[in-house]
Amino acid sequence: MTTAFDIADIKRRMAGAVTSLKQELGGLRTGRASASLLEPITVDAYGANMPLAQVATVSVPEPRLLSVQVWDRGMVNAVEKAIRDSNLGLNPNTEGQTLRIRIPELNEERRKELVKVAHKYAEAARVAVRHVRRDGMDLLKKLEKDSAISSDDMERLSKDVQKATDETISEVDQTLAHKEKEILSV
């Protein structure tokens, strides 16, 4: 009789927080080139702001080099301007319809700043997971109060929710540790 409570939905919502964290961390600049570094950039194209991925192809030919192949020759200057204005500290060199972006080494101070930002993102993900947990527990309490589930079911499902929370927060911590190691490695 526990049809009103779906643990799979709770797990899916918690996994969404981890996915969001991974996307945010992917946008943090480390010392290595990564195509995801340019994902948040929007280009003023054809009278609208468009994601860079809709006007160009980004590739990583070398560990410290990004290559941006612009599809429309008329968009090269707009793409270059968008990359320069992105606050990522990147300086593209134009060669025809291709922009080459050398990724500079990060200094120690900038690395520490990036680690702090990564910790903020991870904490936001943990908070999101805890909110999902709270929502699940509130629903369980309501179902128990309305006699839709027994106290034994309440106990079992509460443990399932807590287990899912612990597993997800552990995944957040592992993701953060991996990114921190990546940022701090010279």
From Swiss-Prot:
Keywords: Cytoplasm, Protein biosynthesis
Subcellular location as annotated: Cytoplasm
Gene Ontology molecular-function annotations: ribosomal large subunit binding
Pfam families assigned to the protein according to its UniProt record, in alphabetical order: RRF (PF01765)
InterPro entries for this protein: Ribosome_recyc_fac, Ribosome_recyc_fac_dom, RRF_sf
PANTHER family tied to this protein: MITOCHONDRIAL RIBOSOME RECYCLING FACTOR PSEUDO 1, RIBOSOME RECYCLING FACTOR
Species the sequence originates in: Azorhizobium caulinodans (strain ATCC 43989 / DSM 5975 / JCM 20966 / LMG 6465 / NBRC 14845 / NCIMB 13405 / ORS 571)
GO CC field: cytosol
Name used for this protein in its record: Ribosome-recycling factor
Family assignment from sequence similarity: Belongs to the RRF family.
Record-level GO BP terms: cytoplasmic translational termination
Function: Responsible for the release of ribosomes from messenger RNA at the termination of protein biosynthesis. May increase the efficiency of translation by recycling ribosomes from one round of translation to another.
